[in-house]
Amino acid sequence: MDSFKQNAVVFDCAGTLVEMYRVTKSLKTGQVILDADNLKLISESPGSGLIIMDAPLDLIKNQPPERLLSEFLRSEKIPFGVAFAADGFDAGDISRVLLTDQTKMKSFLETNEEAISYFDDIIYEVFGFIVSSSENKITYIMSTGGKLFENAKDVVTAALENCDVFIASGDDYGNLNRVAEKLGIQKDNVIGLCNDVKKENIILELQNHYPKVIMIGDGLNDLLALNAADLGILISRSNYYTPENLMDAADNIVDDLGECTEILQSYLLE
């Protein structure tokens, strides 16, 4: 990797650069959870993992409602990744569960309609589902809508003055590249479909090339990366799930993205 600047900043995306509204549906009860916290849900469900589909939005939205999710993934050769998982989850179970699963695309279309109605200026639409290794089935499906935080552009622009800027996220590349383009982040510096271990490895790899590597995130799947970074900044908002072990992993805790600029500038001058 050729570095052009002395330092690197890695941003999570959803919840960090993008304000999210998540809609999650239980396939067991039919309950629809508005403004859901999927990482909290998974952390309280041993053996569960959040799977994100990396498919073009138009392709998903134009699917026949009665088409099976499993057939869609297989026939369209849709990549997917594990964004976050609780203890006891086995990624090898995903394909096995899909062999007999009867989840239909209409569930995603319905939750998507609800998710994108929350904001006027949507830039982010994510589709995913939760697999339970212990129950051997898909337990929830989810869709999210998101818009850039108002100060995201200013924070990233300030970081770019002294740092190479990266995005590392569990979400799909289509959404991440759209955000990167809006914020002036190089497409080559976008890494999607990351779980917590992959994020940590990204930090460790960057530390081979930069004297200082900073991680900015907000969720449980950022914990390992925050801990590994030379400086870890956690954004802990009142409506976000922030357990104690996540706070312990960070060097600084803020409640607004905009506070990161001053912390970055001060740290880089040390």
Positions of PLM-derived features:
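Donor nucleotide-activated moiety binding/catalytic core segment of transferases
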Residues: G192-K212
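Short acidic-hydrophobic, aromatic-tinged amphipathic segments that line or gate anion-handling sites
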Residues: D188-N195, D251-E259
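Acidic, Mg2+-coordinating phosphoryl-transfer loop and its flanking beta/alpha structural elements
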Residues: V165-Y173, Y210-N252
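Structural motif corresponding to alpha-helix initiation and N-cap regions
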Residues: F149, D196-E200, G219
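Short, charged, surface-exposed secondary-structure boundary motifs
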Residues: K198-L204, T242-D251, I263-S266
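Short hydrophobic/aromatic-enriched beta-strand-loop microsegments
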Residues: I185-C194, G232-R237
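Alpha-helical substrate-recognition element adjacent to the catalytic core
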Residues: D2-K182, N189
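Hydrophobic/aromatic ligand-binding patch that stacks against planar heteroaromatic rings
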Residues: T157, V179, E205, L224-A225, ...
